[in-house]
Regions:
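Short beta->alpha connector loops at strand-helix junctions that form conserved
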Residues: 45, 482-484, 503-506, 594, ...
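Conserved alpha/beta-domain cores
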Residues: 98-99, 551, 561-904
Length: 904
């Protein structure tokens, strides 16, 4: 553990720097770095992430004792640079206390502003500034934040609004004003007293008046917020380890609410929604930062072009816009120039799109934060390619800048243009996060989760979102808010998740208790359908048809770049020609798994399949299989043709036969009629197929060994289709894979059937086709005896679903009953069926690859389980020397990027 727990910064000097984010968190490291490169930052200090972890081991009293000397010295350092004193009524220093983990977690943890205020300090500040409105506005904000974050003042139930907001609304009503900033000094003073009384009533404790007590309460509250529900959920979603901890940054306050020459804002060096190289953001005059970020007031645009675009969407004329909603570029031109120059400097320094917070205090600009901005998948790809073209980063960095999972967003459906032209627009908001979303209205996060769990698609409608809504936002198709701008919590989090979001739709009136939203005099209830266009900000009544997204030139360029560096081929799992074509458009270089059993469930095919199962002689089975042969051949013909010139790996029949027969009374009666036998006979045969443990029973190669005629029919269908295509001038490249091998003898037996059948087929068609015979490694014994199996197999395909199941001894279908407890108790960090277990299952794979190649140096190896599209699993496969990974068609781009990242 680091001995030093507190690092100071200010006045162009800092004890930390940008590369210390693991210790100082992203915020603390960047505050230090901005000081060092000449960006104006208020002085302060950062308490390390190690101290957060220490807090959870030793508790609050001990951590305060351990930190006391360093924090007191750091406060004195800040006092000296600001020329004022913490807690001194005549010349007071106020501070902000903010969280900051090494990975950005917007809004997930807690912030407190204006700390250090009490009645005496407030009076002293009024005497010093001559601005009582500013002082008591700051004071009521501090009591509200401290009451919420440190003392736990929350709404009592989900229908209630924040208890402090309820008090504010009542006081505004009494005074007859609409906006917080129009409250009189007397009303603000009244709010301070009402807030304190509410805290006393609910918690039983007086609001702390000693600034030092306030500071320690806030520091420890930020540490506690690392383990709040929303932070834990966000970390789970983003794959951030609990043990990283959060740093705490304490910084001298600068005030955006000191009057008309003060302001606060959030800005991005490029568009976080579409990646356009356009400086953009929002600001509020006479406000504090939380007003912008929390979406409590809908702010104005920073740039003139941004303001004009906003006005056009909102249907506001240029004259009205310029008069009533001027951009910062127009209202504060000199400050805007300084802000623009500094944002450009920061982007060039960090060589990435920056998300920045700033405050203007009486005409002086201060930066409070910079970080690499959260962005949509579309923006991620465009920004990476643009920075590459601008010479700011190289090709390898461009590949590493893109998150594989976020490519999924580019493949999401968009609204069909014809359907959109006929749809009814019911309101217009801000296009906070692009995409198309249709769903039923819900108003609360827990309802969104419940409805989603029931298989319903929902749109979460809120006045504004807060970090507590994270789980609901994750479950929803899209988010609609009445308040908040493009940089509000809803917008930033939705973009990070790739969720469609329309914010600041001011014409909507949300009633949580009635569970209704009124839009232009029409009332929509919970459960009604609406559609959101996150790209334009338009909201529509009902459901609108969607279509597949069109991929951009930037996407193609990124994929070409990946292919330039990758050492591993990406194939797809496809059971139909349509799936094969889709995957090919996404760049799949072949098929890593075709499941033949999926082809048997069409009406005519299932009848023949059931006939085969019912037969109790070889002749009877062969007669039924002869009916299946043309169907199978036609299926393989379509897939091999769609993947002409590419490897197509076809798995022989794998599931147990009981999966193909009906288990309900009506289904058995229908089957009896189709087969021309009695229902009793059907029941008897179905019962005879029952197994105690079917997943380890009569399936895979065991079916082919007991019924070799099944293997022969499938081989005949595969090679017959290939021969026909070769005669037509195509280049089919079939691979025949024997599933569930545990011993080399099983593979030898099945191989002999395949080779004998191949000889017959080639003689019949008068043409030969090159093909390969391989096996699936999905039983631990097969992995352990890979050297022997490789003598008979030309390739190994690792079926990681079953290999994981048999190595852990977990049933994939039943793991949900205990996995949540395992995750909570940290027995498992991730679901091993989603992320490959590299320590156990991975070692079996590594051993099998190495031992197999010791016997057969040209042995090709690949992975075809669900893990084939999961980025960390793909990187592991590349590391152990696999030739390919195979995944579902829509995960092909994700796997291509992950494979390239493994190579660079």
């Amino acid at each position: 553990m680091s001995e030093k727990r507190v690092y100071t910064f200010g006045n162009g000097k800092a004890e930390g720097k940008a590369d210390m984010r693991n210790l100082l968190g992203g915020k603390g490291a960047n505050l230090a770095e901005m000081n060092l490169i000449g960006v104006p930052v208020p002085p302060g200090f950062t308490i390390t992430t190690d101290t957060c972890n220490e807090y959870y081991k030793v508790g609050q009293a001990k951590i305060v004792e351990l930190l006391a000397d360093e924090v007191n010295a750091a406060v004195a350092h800040t006092e000296e640079l600001m020329n004022c004193k913490f807690g001194d009524p005549k010349n007071p220093l106020l501070v902000s206390v903010r969280s900051g983990a090494r990975a950005s977690m917007p809004g997930m943890m807690d912030t407190i502003l204006n700390l250090g205020l009490n009645d005496e300090v407030a009076e002293g500040m009024v005497a010093k500034t001559g601005n009582p409105h500013f002082v008591y506005d700051s004071y009521r904000r501090f009591v509200q934040m401290y009451g919420d974050v440190v003392l736990g003042m929350k709404p009592e139930n989900k229908e209630d609004i924040d208890p402090f907001e309820a008090i504010i609304e009542k006081v505004k009503e009494e005074q007859g004003v609409v906006l917080d900033k129009d409250l009189s000094v007397e009303s603000l003073k009244k709010l301070v007293e009402l807030f304190k009384q509410a805290i006393k009533d609910q918690t039983g404790n007086d609001f702390p008046t000693d600034p030092k007590e306030q500071l320690w309460g806030a520091i420890c509250a930020v540490f506690r917020s690392w383990m709040n529900e929303r932070a834990i959920l966000y970390r789970k979603m983003e794959g951030i380890p609990d043990e990283w901890g959060t740093a705490v940054s304490v910084m001298a306050m600068v005030f955006g609410n000191m009057g008309e020459t003060s302001a606060t804002g959030v800005c991005f060096s490029r568009d976080a929604g579409n990646g356009e190289n356009l400086f953009n953001g929002e600001y509020l005059i006479n406000a504090q930062g939380e007003d912008v970020v929390a979406g409590i007031r809908t702010p104005q645009q920073i740039t003139k072009i941004g303001s004009q675009r906003w006005a056009e969407r909102a249907g506001i004329s240029e004259e009205e816009r310029a008069a009533n909603y001027p951009s910062m570029e127009e209202a504060m031109p000199e400050l805007y120039k300084e802000l623009d120059a500094l944002q450009d400097k920061l982007e060039k320094h960090y060589r990435d799109m920056q998300d920045m917070e700033f405050t203007v205090q009486e005409g002086k600009l201060w930066f409070l934060q910079t970080r690499n901005g959260k962005r949509t998948g579309t923006a991620m790809v465009k920004i990476a390619m643009d920075l590459l073209h601008e010479g700011m980063i190289d090709e390898k960095t461009a590949i590493l800048r893109c998150e594989p999972q976020k490519l999924d967003e580019l493949l999401h459906p968009v609204f069909d243009k014809l359907a959109l032209s006929k749809a009814k627009v019911i309101t217009q908001g801000l296009p906070a996060s692009p995409g198309a979303a249709c769903g039923q209205i819900v108003f609360h996060a827990d309802d969104a989760e419940e409805w989603h769990a029931d298989g319903k698609k929902v749109i979460m409608v809120r006045i504004e979102t807060s970090p507590e809504d994270l789980a609901g936002m994750s479950a929803a198709e899209g988010i609609l808010t009445a308040r908040g701008g493009m940089t509000s919590h809803a917008a930033v989090v939705a973009r990070g998740m790739g969720k469609c979001c329309v914010s600041g739709a001011g014409s909507i009136n949300v009633d949580y208790k009635a569970k209704t939203v009124e839009i232009e005099d029409v009332v929509y209830k919970e459960g009604d359908f609406i559609s959101l266009n996150g790209t334009t900000g338009q909201v529509y009544a009902g459901q609108i048809e969607t279509k597949a997204a069109e991929l951009s030139g930037d996407f193609k360029e990124l994929m070409d770049l990946c292919d330039k560096y990758t050492k591993m081929e990406i194939r797809t799992n496809a059971d139909t020609p349509h799936d094969a074509k889709v995957a090919r458009t996404f760049g799949a270089k072949g098929i890593g798994l075709t499941r033949t059993e999926h082809m048997f469930f069409d009406d005519q095919k299932i009848v023949a399949m059931r006939e085969m199962i019912l037969a109790d002689t070889v002749e009877g089975r062969e007669k039924a299989l002869a009916k299946l042969l043309p169907y199978q051949k036609a299926d393989f013909y379509g897939i091999l043709k769609a993947m002409d010139g590419c490897h197509v790996n076809i798995r022989l029949l794998d599931p147990p036969l009981h999966e193909f027969v009906p288990h309900d009374k009506a289904g058995q009666e229908t089957m009896a009629k189709e087969m021309g036998v009695s229902v009793t006979e059907i029941k008897k045969r179905v019962n005879s197929l029952a197994e105690n443990n079917p997943m380890l029973g009569h399936r895979g190669c065991r079916l082919g060994i007991t019924f070799p005629e099944i293997t022969a029919m499938q081989t005949r269908a595969i090679l017959g289709a290939a021969c026909q295509l070769k005669k037509e001038g195509f280049n089919p490249r079939p691979e025949i894979m024997v599933p569930l091998i545990g011993t080399v003898q099983e593979l030898k037996q099945q191989k002999s059937v395949i080779l004998a059948t191949a000889k017959e087929v080639f003689a019949e068609y008068g043409v030969e086709v090159e093909f390969e015979i391989g096996t699936m490694i999905e039983i631990p014994r097969a992995a352990l005896t890979a050297a022997k199996i490789a003598k008979e197999a030309q390739y190994f395909s690792f079926g990681t679903n079953d290999l994981t199941q048999m190595t852990f001894g977990y049933s994939r279908d039943d793991i949900a009953t205990f996995l949540p407890a395992y995750m909570e108790k940290k027995i498992l960090k991730v679901d091993p069926f989603q992320v490959l277990d590299q320590e156990g299952v991975g070692q079996l794979i590594k051993m099998a690859v190495e031992n197999g190649r010791a016997t057969r140096p040209d042995l090709r190896t690949g992975i075809c389980g669900e893990h084939g599209g999961e980025p960390s699993s793909v990187k592991f496969c590349a590391k152990v020397g696999m030739n390919y990974a195979s995944c579902s068609p829509f995960r092909v781009p994700i796997a291509r990027l992950a494979a390239a990242q493994a190579a660079v």
